[in-house]
């Protein structure tokens, strides 16, 4: 069976297995747990002590707690990525075996944060490194008594790339012929146009 929150694919087996774990909690505690997971997804950090308190009644082992956080993170982020509305998500979770009141609690939480979550995921997705700075130089030899032939101009690029926000930038240097530089520039402009059309 295909589910919209899974991108119109089958639900992963590990998610199916953890649905029964979610059902062991009360719907109120599930909602509070969802709030914590949403904070983490929005980059605000997660309070593990609070999570342990919320799952204490259900007598979860540490593996169950981690699995519960992972499955909620998957469900909420996946639903946001695929623009699934709360009602559809609730229906799909019930089809997977989550009790109706649990699904309603989870979806209420999801609907409250759906828009900021989608915005945050959009900012974070498809981003591998951050460009911190660019330097360039063109070497062009007009003539030389030492060379038999004059070489074509060379473009030397130096990119300062940070792996993540707040990390120090690492230099990446490269040298390109004028032709290769023109191809690189054209492809970068094409990529920029495509990305800006996506919003």
Swiss-Prot record:
The alphabetical list of record keywords is: Cytoplasm, Nucleus, Transcription, Transcription regulation, Ubl conjugation pathway
Q: Which InterPro entries match?
A: COMM (IPR017920), COMMD4 (IPR037356), COMMD4/6/7/8 (IPR047155)
Q: Where is the COMM domain?
A: 130-199
Segment forming the signal sequence: none
Asked if the keyword Cytoplasm belongs to this entry, the reply reads yes
In terms of Pfam families, this protein maps to: COMM_domain (PF07258), COMM_HN (PF21672)
Q: Name one GO biological process term.
A: signal transduction
Described function: Scaffold protein in the commander complex that is essential for endosomal recycling of transmembrane cargos; the commander complex is composed of the CCC subcomplex and the retriever subcomplex. May modulate activity of cullin-RING E3 ubiquitin ligase (CRL) complexes. Down-regulates activation of NF-kappa-B.
State how it assembles: Component of the commander complex consisting of the CCC subcomplex and the retriever subcomplex. Component of the CCC (COMMD/CCDC22/CCDC93) subcomplex consisting of COMMD1, COMMD2, COMMD3, COMMD4, COMMD5, COMMD6, COMMD7, COMMD8, COMMD9, COMMD10, CCDC22 and CCDC93; within the complex forms a heterodimer with COMMD8. Interacts with RELA, RELB, NFKB1/p105. Interacts with CCDC22, CCDC93, SCNN1B, CUL2, CUL3, CUL4A, CUL5, CUL7.
- Its protein name is COMM domain-containing protein 4
**Source species:** Homo sapiens (Human)
């Amino acid at each position: 069976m295909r589910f919209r929150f899974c991108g119109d694919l089958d639900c992963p087996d590990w998610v199916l297995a953890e649905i029964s774990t979610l059902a062991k909690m009360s719907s109120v505690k599930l909602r509070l747990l969802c709030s914590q997971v949403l904070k983490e997804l929005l980059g605000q950090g997660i309070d593990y002590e609070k999570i342990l308190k919320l799952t204490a009644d259900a007598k979860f082992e540490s593996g169950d707690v981690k699995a519960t956080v992972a499955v909620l993170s998957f469900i909420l982020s996946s639903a946001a990525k695929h623009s699934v509305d709360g009602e559809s998500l609730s229906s799909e979770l019930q089809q997977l075996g989550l009790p109706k009141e649990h699904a309603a609690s989870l979806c209420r939480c999801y609907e409250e944060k759906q828009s900021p979550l989608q915005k945050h995921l959009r900012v974070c997705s498809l981003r591998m490194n951050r460009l911190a700075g660019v330097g360039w130089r063109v070497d062009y030899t007009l003539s030389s008594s030492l060379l038999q032939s004059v070489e074509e101009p060379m473009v030397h690029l130096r990119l300062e790339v940070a792996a993540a926000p707040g990390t120090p930038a690492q230099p990446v240097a490269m040298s390109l012929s004028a032709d290769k530089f023109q191809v690189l520039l054209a492809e970068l402009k094409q990529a920029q146009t495509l990305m800006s059309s996506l919003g």
